[in-house]
Design a protein with these regions (language model features):
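Aromatic-rich carbohydrate-recognition surfaces in CAZymes
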Residues: 91-119, 123-227, 442-456
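Acidic, low-complexity proline/glycine-rich segments
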Residues: 14-31, 228-244, 466
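C-terminal capping/lid segments that line or modulate ligand- or cofactor-binding pockets
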Residues: 152-158, 163-166, 329-349, 387-468
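Active-site-adjacent bridging/hinge elements
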Residues: 67-81, 144-153, 238-250, 419-426
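Low-complexity, Ser/Thr/Pro/Gly-enriched N-terminal "stalk/linker" regions
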Residues: 2, 6-96
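Well-ordered alpha-helical scaffold segments within catalytic/enzyme domains
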Residues: 38-51, 100-113, 172-187, 266-285, ...
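Extended ligand-binding clefts on enzyme/binding-domain cores
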Residues: 95, 131-135, 139-142, 148, ...
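Extended, well-ordered alpha-helical scaffold segments
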Residues: 58, 113-129, 187-206, 275, ...
Length: 468
């Protein structure tokens, strides 16, 4: 099940590490899609600090992977930067993936004007995508009338790669734009396109509270994959309108079971508050800012009331999904936003006792999608299925850890499950890392680089260098 998606990119990966020869697995310099002096300097700086040759090699392969292989930067017809970001082996732009893929480069934007311009291009492209259709999760680079999912039973358009309604698709662009603004002070991205996008986001969130009926969105697909379509004539399972927002699909692109997806509702709260701050400070749009804050407050109150469950072993925990009727789905999926990742996104405090209980629950065999085997352990999900651990979950355990020994175990496990390629994969079999999916998955590669860089910047070089 090793999916070799792009022969030019991955063909030579497998022999380098096994021979102890850690030569770069990056594309040749001429073939790299985007080059950043600041990113190259940062790679050189970190590599000098890391004594473990394999870890140093993996960092250098992974951290620039989004820039090397997925970033298509150009100027739009309006003269503004426009950046279309592939997810990797699928040549479409997910709002979630693209927002996460370029995130760790924002901290370097002030050292590299070209990088800063490219990032502004991602933000502007995301706003454009939202204004094409705020219900979509992935977009084409222009209109493709014979696109892959044009036959889906939903309001498809040729500009859309896929039209699965996922709350987090509208949160990641807000997170990225706010972070970019905080780091660079650049307000040029917050023009007319932004105001239209945030109005679309606000309206879509309100529609999917389903207080005024079921709203305009339906989705069905002819498929053998049960979680690629919605029941009840494309509306999904019923919800009671208690103030939470429906997410028909998860960040894994799988259908929700109960449609109030808890981690994504937490993400909506913080994202709306960030949007409100931009609207107030940059645009002087005080009324819309107040609307965003009021919606955030309402969702937050509903989460306090409906999102927790009193577990017999772990105490009060956050459920993964609820429906407002009193039903709770107790599990976690590796894709972010997840229950495990909530402090990473800044949506809950890592010291919140309910979160800590939840963290113990999701990393245990009480979570139906927690897998542990000879090669490693972690959380997967129904997207790939039984026994397949997603490295993303191991990274999120490290990102949210307060324990150096735990962080070290996570990094070692990530290093030991690359199947000799020097890259992260979507998932690997718990007993055999050579049995993996997606050889070219830029989000997880760049996220690994982000994690190592964070640990270096937090003074944990000695911890990383103690890994054998």
């Amino acid at each position: 099940s090793c999916l070799l998606a792009d022969a030019g990119f991955v063909a030579v990966q497998d022999n380098t590490a096994s021979a102890g020869n850690y030569s770069s697995n990056r594309p040749k310099e001429k073939q790299r899609l985007f080059r950043s002096t600041a990113v190259e300097k940062e790679i050189a700086r970190v590599q000098k600090l890391l004594k473990n040759r394999k870890l140093s090699w993996m960092f250098a392969n992974c951290f620039p992977n989004t820039l090397d292989t997925t970033v298509h930067f150009r100027k739009g017809s309006d003269g503004k930067p426009d950046t279309f970001v592939y997810t990797g082996d699928i040549h479409a732009m997910w709002l979630r993936d693209s927002g996460a893929q370029v995130w760790p480069y924002v901290q370097l934007a002030n050292n590299d004007p070209k990088l800063k311009e490219m990032l502004a291009g991602v933000i502007l492209r995301q706003f454009k995508c939202i204004n094409i259709d705020p219900y979509a999760n992935a977009y084409n680079d222009g209109a493709l009338p014979d696109g892959h999912w044009m036959s889906d039973l939903t309001d498809m358009k040729p500009e859309l790669h896929e039209r699965k309604w996922e709350i987090d698709s509208l949160c990641y662009p807000l997170r990225l734009a706010y972070h970019y603004w905080q780091v660079t002070g650049d307000t040029s991205v917050f023009g007319a396109e932004w105001l239209e996008a945030i109005r679309n986001i606000y309206t879509t969130f309100c529609q999917q509270q389903r207080k005024e009926g079921v709203g305009p969105y339906k989705f069905q697909r002819k498929t053998e994959r049960a979680l690629d379509t919605l029941n009840n004539d494309g509306l999904g399972a019923p919800v009671r309108p208690v103030g939470l927002i429906v997410s028909c699909f998860r960040p894994s692109d799988d259908a929700t079971t109960l449609q109030f997806l808890v981690p994504s509702n937490f993400f909506a709260v913080t994202s709306l508050r960030k949007a409100a701050e931009i609207l107030e400070t940059v645009n002087k749009e005080t009324a819309l800012a107040a609307d965003c804050r009021a919606l955030a407050d309402e969702v937050e109150m509903a989460l306090k009331r409906y999102a927790t469950y009193n577990h017999p072993e772990f105490g009060t925990i956050y459920a993964f999904e609820v429906d407002g009727f009193g039903n709770h789905l107790l599990m976690d999926d590796a894709n972010v936003p997840s229950l495990l990742a909530m402090p990473y996104l800044g949506d809950v405090d890592v010291n919140d006792p309910i979160y800590q209980n939840t963290r113990r629950f999701v990393w245990s065999d009480s979570n139906p999608y927690f897998f542990s085997g000879k090669a490693g352990e972690g959380i997967g999900g129904p997207h790939i299925g039984y026994d397949m651990v997603w490295p993303m979950s191991i990274m999120m355990k490290a990102f949210t850890s307060r324990d150096d020994a735990e962080i070290k175990t996570c990094i070692k496990m990530l290093m030991d499950t690359d199947a000799g390629t020097g890259f992260m994969h979507e998932s690997f079999n718990k007993n055999d890392p050579k049995n993996f999916t997606r050889a070219w998955f830029a989000w997880q590669n760049t996220l690994f680089g982000e994690l190592i860089l964070k640990l270096v910047n937090e003074g944990k070089v000695d911890l990383l260098n103690s890994i054998q």
